[in-house]
From Swiss-Prot:
This is Farnesyl diphosphate synthase. Its EC number is 2.5.1.10. InterPro entries: Isoprenoid_synthase_dom_sf (IPR008949), Polyprenyl_synt (IPR000092), Polyprenyl_synt_CS (IPR033749), Prenyl_diphosphate_synthase (IPR053378). One of its GO terms (biological process) is isoprenoid biosynthetic process. GO terms for cellular component: cytoplasm. It comes from Geobacillus stearothermophilus.
Length: 297
């Protein structure tokens, strides 16, 4: 794909995700305030990196990206639930997210917790409801199992717990990487792995795509840490310096800002290498990799 067509493809897929997310919330039966709280954070914008990684992986394997849309939306729901809970006073106590008041500031802590719970559980419902012969029951089962592992106490939740335990402590590089491989990386990896499952990747392609995603996940978090120092609040949508004020361990704090930038470049190059080795039509995935390296929000 030429660059223009890559950008067009990603824009079209992002719009498809936005439309589907709204449709999934609209069809829910339940308390209006709960639906409103779920929609508030889910439809607050964002890069939609995780759904785009899944859909781009399906496309890279020569399949119709639309087949992966329900799983892409499930991933975004789980990501959004994690942000709602992450912002709570008992966690990071943030007032802004994506340039808007955080969920608990608008709906109260109790409803924010329930909105997160609703998004987390609804995500699994979406995958169970897939009725598409291109995703047979055996693949759906693996998608559910690996999503539970990526999002749960061996994945994202483990990373968040380790992150909280590490506040105010001096961590080693391996301890910091454990946090980020789990808190951020596991769901990014799942996004690509799910795309590989849906797209029918062989064992070698799956292995290389998994490695691509692992390096991309670390690069994403390192860039996030750098933006917490260098970013503009109006672009990143949250207060600059919140990591430092919360005594969080970060790559710049451990390696210096220059060292963090070197580490970012290392992981981006490694991700690109594994993507090339996967021998797929990875233009959109390569473009996302470039966006992660250079993003300002």
């Amino acid at each position: 794909m030429a660059q223009l067509s890559v950008e067009q493809f990603l824009n079209e897929q992002k719009q498809a995700v936005e439309t589907a997310l709204s449709r999934y919330i609209e069809r829910l039966e339940g308390p209006a305030k709960l639906k409103k709280a779920m929609a508030y954070s889910l439809e607050a914008g964002g890069k939609r990196i995780r759904p785009l990684l899944l859909l781009s992986t399906v496309r890279a394997l020569g399949k119709d990206p639309a087949v992966g849309l329900p799983v892409a939306c499930a991933i975004e729901m789980i990501h959004t639930y994690s942000l709602i809970h992450d912002d709570l006073p008992s966690m990071d106590n943030d007032d802004l997210r994506r340039g808007k008041p955080t969920n608990h500031k608008v709906f109260g802590e109790a409803m924010a917790i329930l909105a997160g719970d609703g998004l987390l559980t609804y995500a699994f419902q979406l995958i169970t409801e897939i009725d598409d012969e291109r995703i047979p029951p055996s693949v759906r089962l693996r998608l559910i199992e690996r999503l539970a592992k990526a999002a749960g106490p061996e994945g994202m939740v483990a990373g968040q717990a380790a992150d909280m335990e590490g506040e105010g402590k001096t961590l080693t590089l391996s301890e910091l990487e454990y946090i980020h491989r789990h808190k951020t990386g596991k769901m990014l990896q799942y996004s690509v792995h799910a795309g590989a499952l849906i797209g029918g990747a062989d064992a070698r392609q799956t292995r290389e795509l998994d490695e691509f995603a692992a390096h991309l996940g670390l690069a994403f978090q390192i860039r996030d840490d750098i933006l917490d120092i260098e970013g503009a609040e109006e672009k990143i949508g949250k207060p600059v310096g919140s990591d430092q004020s919360n005594n969080k361990a970060t790559y710049p704090a451990l390696l210096s800002l220059a060292g963090a930038k070197e580490k970012l470049a290392f992981h981006i190059e490694a991700a690109q290498r594994h993507l090339r080795n996967a021998d797929v039509d990875g233009a959109a995935l390569a473009y996302i990799c470039e966006l992660v390296a250079a993003r300002d929000h």
